[in-house]
């Protein structure tokens, strides 16, 4: 095992190692830290000349093809203290390429919980300063259920009450297409949710609360031809228009 000055600790590491004049490459990589497990078909660091290492963030082009990689947000919390108690876990598959300051993936698959399966395009700019890093996600195909959505949102915004969400959002399987962008402390998302009881347009944002002790969340929902009877468990209501907001 080894630990860096920030407290990140590697528990196990195994790989085939190669090096030539243009890259350093690890094939069949396995890495385990205190919370996460990384599996990658390859991890590479490309350069045009040796002294590029002096400007690692901008000039070293990284590449990695992850499979069955488990990311626990407590690992990220080593470098981003606001996430140090966040126990959300993601199972990641897909290829990521770029220098540290501009990482991108055209098609990344992320699974969370028992029912959430996400395919996204990702652009991450601004690392290694995690607090000011800008994230941009394009949701290509998202399949999930509302209880898991509420659980994910509450893991980033502890003041968000899942019970409030359950009162106005039906517990059904849904497909989401849309975008999300922002920093770890301020995220905005908009898109369309497709369900068997109707389609819902949403706008959502998490942001620091006024007291600076955590995050608040704001959600606006609008729908037409939504099965209000299903939501309210009432046979007296049929399809209708819904517009509501949660803060």
Role assignments for model-derived ranges:
Residues 121-122, 206:
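Conserved two-metal-ion catalytic palm core of "right-hand" nucleic acid polymerases
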Residues 1-113, 130-247:
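Extended amphipathic, helix-rich lipid-handling scaffolds
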Residues 116-118:
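Long, contiguous interaction/targeting segments characteristic
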């Amino acid at each position: 095992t080894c630990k860096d000055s920030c407290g990140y600790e590697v528990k196990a590491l195994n790989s085939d190692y190669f090096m030539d004049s243009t890259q350093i490459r690890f094939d069949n990589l396995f890495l385990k830290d205190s919370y996460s497990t990384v599996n990658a078909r390859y991890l590479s660091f490309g350069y045009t000349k040796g002294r590029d290492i002096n400007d690692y963030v901008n000039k070293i082009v990284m590449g990695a093809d992850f499979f069955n990689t488990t990311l626990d947000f407590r690992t990220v919390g080593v470098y981003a203290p606001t996430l140090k108690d966040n126990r959300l876990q993601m199972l990641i598959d897909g290829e990521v390429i770029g220098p540290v300051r501009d990482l991108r993936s055209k098609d990344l698959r992320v699974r969370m919980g028992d029912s959430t399966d996400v395919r996204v395009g990702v652009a991450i700019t601004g690392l290694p300063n995690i607090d000011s890093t800008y994230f941009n996600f394009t949701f290509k195909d998202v399949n999930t259920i509302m209880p898991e959505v509420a659980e994910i949102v509450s893991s980033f915004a502890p003041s968000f009450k899942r019970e409030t969400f359950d009162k106005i959002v039906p517990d059904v399987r849904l497909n989401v297409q849309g975008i999300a962008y922002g920093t770890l402390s301020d995220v905005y998302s908009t898109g369309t949710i497709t369900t068997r009881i109707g389609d819902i347009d949403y706008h959502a944002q998490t942001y620091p609360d006024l007291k600076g002790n955590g995050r608040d969340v704001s959600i606006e929902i609008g729908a037409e031809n939504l099965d209000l009877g299903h939501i309210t468990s009432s046979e007296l209501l049929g399809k209708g228009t819904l517009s509501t907001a949660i803060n």
